[in-house]
């Protein structure tokens, strides 16, 4: 008897194996059909609060109609010691969630419990250990989860530390995919789960594809956050992702596992209304562009404190539990859209409104979700509907019925229903399929293509959604306008680029006629559809100087985007005078078609420290060259200037010149230097960075923005990398800084603002004054604000500067910021990516 009791006791101490559940559970089947999902419970952060906080969040999710919850599935919890797995915490979570009929989307992450000071793998053993964790975890939960996310935002700190590296993530992804498929051949791997860097991180992703990662994921998962109207940016971004996948393989399903709209609590009345509109428009457009599942981030605010960062205010519910208008708008969207076919987009940009067409197979009717572009506008639109009573569902769920007062005549196929729309989508039921279906369903495919000169790709008019849903119609091309250098063979479904076509963006358009085949309804509809073709240069040359362990190095890259073999030598050229000087040469051998050659070369610091005036470098290969890399020579002095907006003391300081069209990073056509241009000067001392600028501006010192948005008005932006120029693609906030210097702002005074800490530098000195053709501005910023870096003559810094300009009467289309921005060396990614910055050399004056 004692032996039996002992055996029972020992068995009770063993980990409980996950019970295999039938894959045809009705609730699980329903969730697999749903496109709506949430970053909702945060259960792995608070596993001890299942019955309280987590349960409340699950109840909110159910009220919204959402049955998917994205959750961390932390390695260090499941393997607290190397080789010892403990699944007790996740087992409990799985049991609790499945009883609630909530499907978890788990994130395989982050570092091992025995790693110190980092959360990303570095050694061979680290990668192998991660693979073991993936295998054991997927094997245990294979009857519960089909989809697995490999990491979260590996392209930024703090999720990949000490520094993001696409080559390392590619290796990790391949190991994770292999081990997961070994544990469960039916599982689906989702990657690369990248964070947005302004727009989607194409550079990081393309590097993964170049390393063969297209074969190591089943779903393309990425993140985006935008607080501006999405009608232009979002569809273009999704088309670009599809085009890049096609370039390196085949198109795969797209998920967005994080996307949110912030609603600052300082101005609730406006921000809450805008959030309600943008949350819904974002998701509707993504679904119309082919996104299969969309996880909103976040269900609940982290905090309601007005002074906390933007990402703490993304919730549909306040931190205190009060539901925002966006909660009701999201709930209405789920009810109107889920389990219906999202056909596509019906655009009317010239009329100021947009829409997405849905088909309800259960009731065999069409629904149009329609709204005004931009924010704050209203418009009355006459919608063409079937001759029935028409239901209109308003943004927060209110239902209106427009009755048909009399029976329709035998030859009456439609009725017109006038609806006032605004920034919030409204759902008009029973719209006429012939009026809206052709434009929403018929499109050129692919909608975006990357091509080489001389290449032929598949290209056709996609009509199957129209034919499948509306069999009594046919579509034909009645006119097409491929640009010069492109030949569209409509019969064979191909598009071919000539060998001498110039690189750049081309638009291919087609005029389409759709005719109804019904004997009693012979309507004809004509419209235009288009696709974007990006002709790649034969090759791309990239130059990236950087500091590593106090050595100056250069990363040289040749990307062969052509179908031909390339051979030759790479030259580093110094551009200082009319006669460029070759500093070094490197034989790259043969670069195969669609391949990349990359090498890191050691440079002698003397080639940058012996000069007193600014200059630039370029890499040249065959007849192609890289963008210039600009190098500024800044004085390092013991004395500091007087900050009084008088630049007489600066007359012998070299100028960083910003006055060329190619330096524009934001703004409309028609720029001239008189609109905005200028010179920026830097003067370093042992305890301060001193900055001055002489700006040409036809409406000077106009800036009414709050401090964290001074870049939207007249202002300088300064970028400083105190560990030297960098090749990393993401800021290291300990050494990389973005500073705004504005002559005026919402506070009615000039300020210096540290963006990454979201604060005014009150210890900085700043002065500005107008001039006959613009303004001058001058500032001194203590080095202690940057962690007190030690500078000296010969120090090399990452450096860049931008001049931002806004005039009182400037205007831009919805979704765009008015005014201009000009950048000395970098790009629009400067705020997050220091690899685009130039370099400063500090020189002690004699």
Language-model features: where?
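Noncatalytic carbohydrate-binding groove/subsite architecture in carbohydrate-active enzymes
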Residues: 166-283, 289-291
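C-terminal beta-strand-rich structural cap/linker in extracellular carbohydrate-active enzymes
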Residues: 402-441
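Carbohydrate-binding surface patches
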Residues: 348-388
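Substrate-binding cleft and catalytic face of glycoside hydrolase catalytic domains
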Residues: 61-216, 224-227
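N-terminal carbohydrate-binding accessory modules
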Residues: 21-67, 80-81, 95, 99-101, ...
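Structural preference for beta-rich elements and adjacent junctions enriched in aromatics
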Residues: 543-553, 557-559, 595-846
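Intrinsically disordered, low-complexity Pro/Gly/Ser/Thr-rich segments with frequent PxxP/GP/PP motifs
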Residues: 484-503, 577-608
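Aromatic/acidic polysaccharide-binding cleft in carbohydrate-active enzymes
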Residues: 265-331, 344-353
């Amino acid at each position: 008897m004692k032996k039996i009791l002992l055996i029972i006791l020992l068995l009770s101490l063993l980990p409980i194996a996950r019970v295999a559940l039938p894959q045809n559970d009705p609730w699980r089947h329903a969730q697999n059909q749903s496109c709506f999902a949430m970053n909702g419970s945060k259960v792995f952060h608070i596993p001890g609060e299942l019955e309280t906080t987590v349960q409340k969040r699950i109840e909110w999710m159910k009220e919204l109609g959402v049955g998917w919850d994205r959750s961390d599935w932390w390695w260090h919890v499941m393997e607290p010691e190397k080789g010892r797995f403990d699944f007790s915490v996740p087992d409990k979570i799985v049991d609790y969630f499945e009883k609630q009929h909530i499907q978890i989307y788990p994130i395989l992450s982050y570092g091992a419990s025995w790693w110190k000071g980092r959360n990303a793998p570095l050694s061979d053993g680290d990668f192998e250990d991660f693979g073991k964790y993936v295998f054991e975890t997927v094997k245990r939960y294979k009857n519960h989860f089909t989809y697995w996310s490999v990491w979260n935002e590996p392209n930024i700190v703090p999720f990949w530390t000490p520094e993001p590296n696409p080559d390392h993530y590619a290796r990790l992804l391949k190991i994770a995919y292999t081990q997961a498929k070994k544990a469960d051949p039916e599982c689906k791997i989702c990657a690369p789960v990248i964070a947005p860097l302004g727009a989607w991180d194409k550079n990081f992703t393309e590097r993964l594809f170049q390393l063969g990662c297209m074969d190591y994921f089943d779903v393309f998962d990425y993140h985006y956050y935008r607080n501006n109207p999405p009608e232009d940016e979002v569809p273009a971004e999704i088309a670009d992702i599809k085009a890049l996948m096609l370039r390196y393989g085949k198109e795969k399903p797209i998920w967005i596992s994080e996307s949110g709209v912030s609603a600052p609590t300082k101005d609730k009345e406006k921000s809450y209304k805008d959030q309600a509109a943008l949350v819904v428009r974002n998701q509707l457009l993504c679904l119309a562009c082919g996104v299969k599942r969309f996880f909103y981030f976040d269900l609940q605010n982290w905090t309601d404190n007005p002074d906390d960062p933007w990402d703490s205010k993304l919730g549909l519910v306040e931190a205190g539990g009060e539901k925002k208008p966006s909660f009701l708008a999201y709930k209405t969207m789920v009810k109107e859209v889920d389990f219906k076919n999202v056909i596509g987009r019906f655009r009317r940009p010239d009329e100021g409104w947009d829409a997405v067409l849905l088909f309800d197979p259960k009731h065999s009717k069409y629904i149009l979700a329609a709204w005004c572009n931009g924010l704050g506008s209203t418009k009355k639109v006459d919608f063409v509907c079937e001759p029935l009573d028409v239901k209109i569902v308003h943004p927060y769920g209110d239902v209106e019925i427009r009755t048909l007062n009399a029976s329709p005549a035998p030859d009456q196929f439609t009725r017109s229903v006038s609806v006032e729309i605004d920034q919030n989508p409204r759902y008009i039921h029973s719209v006429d399929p012939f009026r809206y279906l052709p434009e929403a369903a018929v499109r050129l495919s692919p909608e975006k293509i990357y091509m080489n000169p001389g290449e032929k790709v598949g290209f056709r008019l996609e009509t199957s959604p129209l034919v499948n849903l509306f069999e009594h119609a046919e579509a034909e091309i009645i006119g097409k306008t491929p640009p010069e250098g492109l030949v569209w063979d409509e019969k064979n479904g191909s598009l071919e680029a000539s060998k001498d076509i110039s690189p750049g963006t081309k638009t291919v358009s087609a005029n389409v006629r759709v005719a109804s085949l019904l004997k009693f309804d012979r309507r004809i509809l004509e419209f235009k559809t288009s696709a974007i073709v990006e002709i790649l240069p034969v090759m791309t040359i990239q130059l990236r100087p950087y500091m590593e362990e106090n050595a100056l190095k250069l990363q040289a890259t040749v990307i062969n985007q052509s179908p031909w073999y390339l051979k030759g030598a790479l030259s580093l050229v110094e551009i200082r005078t009319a006669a460029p000087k070759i500093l070094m040469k490197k034989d790259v051998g043969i670069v195969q078609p669609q391949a990349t050659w990359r090498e890191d070369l050691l440079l002698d610091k003397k080639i940058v420290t012996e000069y007193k005036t600014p200059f630039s470098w370029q890499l040249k290969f065959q007849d192609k060259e890289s963008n210039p890399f600009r190098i500024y020579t800044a004085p390092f002095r013991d004395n500091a200037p007087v900050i009084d907006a008088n630049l007489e003391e600066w007359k012998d300081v070299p100028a960083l010149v910003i006055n060329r069209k190619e330096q524009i990073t934001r703004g409309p056509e028609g720029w001239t230097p008189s609109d905005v241009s200028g010179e920026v000067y830097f003067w370093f001392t042992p305890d301060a960075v001193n900055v001055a600028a002489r700006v040409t501006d036809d409406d000077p010192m106009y800036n009414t923005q709050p401090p964290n948005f001074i870049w939207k008005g007249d202002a300088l932006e300064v970028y400083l990398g105190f560990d030297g120029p960098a090749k990393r693609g993401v800021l290291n906030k300990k050494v990389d800084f973005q500073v705004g210097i504005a002559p005026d702002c919402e506070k009615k005074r000039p300020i210096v603002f540290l963006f990454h800490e979201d604060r005014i530098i009150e210890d900085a000195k700043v002065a500005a004054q107008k001039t006959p053709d613009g303004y001058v501005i001058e500032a001194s910023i203590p080095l202690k604000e940057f962690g007190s870096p030690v500078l000296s003559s010969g120090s090399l810094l990452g450096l860049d500067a931008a001049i931002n300009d806004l005039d009182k009467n400037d205007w831009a289309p919805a979704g765009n910021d008015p005014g201009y921005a000009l950048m000395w060396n970098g790009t629009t990614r400067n705020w997050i990516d220091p690899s685009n910055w130039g370099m400063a050399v500090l020189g002690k004056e004699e």
